[in-house]
Amino acid sequence: MALHDAEIVRTMGCGIAGLSIVADSLAAIKYAKVYPIRDETGLVVDYRTEGDFPTYGNDDDRADDIAATVVHTVMDKIRAIPMYRDAIPTQSVLTITSNVVYGKATGSFPSGHEKGTPFAPGANPENGIDTHGMVASMLSVGKLDYNDALDGISLTNTITPQGLGRSKEEQIQNLVGILDAGFVPDDSCAYDGTKGY
């Protein structure tokens, strides 16, 4: 007990799954024409979407602002709920594998996401929808307010060394450049090859 804090701070963690699909679907409703398709009982079972709409993960403020608004609105709703033992409510956008399970149990969306297919993990753009590259998706995720997701926000990317360049020096320089573009607001921390890092 000697290592316990004198005053215990409790948190209650909640999470968002499918953020990119919700953002893209709301963008489709706002910028395109979306028609619900109903079954014989009147239940909406699919959508027909006509026209173009911006998508989250491409550094397009129209879609990225929708995603940020969703995260903020959900967190505001959570904050309004009294928490057990005065816990501090928190939220995450960082599914690990649950995005697959949730997607398999969910219907179609106005964005074109098909029934029964996995959601993108965490704050990633919808699978196959990001067309402007890794840096654009990093910039989109960077528009989410961390104060609304204190449990964490994840963006999963995969790069092979060969995809970064031919020589080790080129690979290091390109990787640092990608990270700088996504995380450094100016060039004050830009890569300097003379420093050996």
Where in this protein do the model-derived segments appear?
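Acidic, glycine-enriched catalytic cores built around paired aspartates
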Residues: 1-197
